[in-house]
């Protein structure tokens, strides 16, 4: 059976080959007939396009688009904790962001209509009002734990998917087991978009960490900001105003004040049975609610 030939845009192909700075002579050795694909005298199969993408180290999907997208500019628009400079971003993180941007570009073309909640709020809004709205959109009660039981991550993922948000989990670059994602570098990121918003979660994190990141990035969508999330729990928890606002909402959704005050004990082991978050988040919540003092914290 003959493989299906693809009508690849030659300008797109040439753009990414030149941008990769891979010498043409080397590419010709790695990919047979690459010159014929560039001048249009031959059409490549999907596997052959994949070979080119691998040779120039970009996602295959970029070569299948009808126009180029400048992923580097989009990547540099991200904010990180403490406004960290992104020049030192690992190739694993950079390639993962590119992969998600390609997926988003494709999905955007398949979807009609806009999502009205993306960018609906700002940090000047009352955080409790934002919490109420997010709960309404997710269709979850304040005491969601009764419904989620011990599967809170799956519970929220399904609720978020239902809103038209695409959620991806991975602990490596695509299927490459040699290119693992570093939890010390990032826990997740969000690509805000009115049609095809994407949340990516670093699967190397704990389940409770993944859940906190998932809700954290969801809140960023309601504010309409792209972000790479990286909070190491031993840090001093200092954020810019946007991060402080987002984390306040995230904590209230996952550990509602009314539910926490119902607990008769502040023993962390007991509280962990009721709330699917880390002990650090619980202690921080107790401090913010003035249930414990700064000294105890």
Report the location of each language-model feature.
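Short juxta-domain linker segments that transition from a proline/glycine-rich
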Residues: 1-297
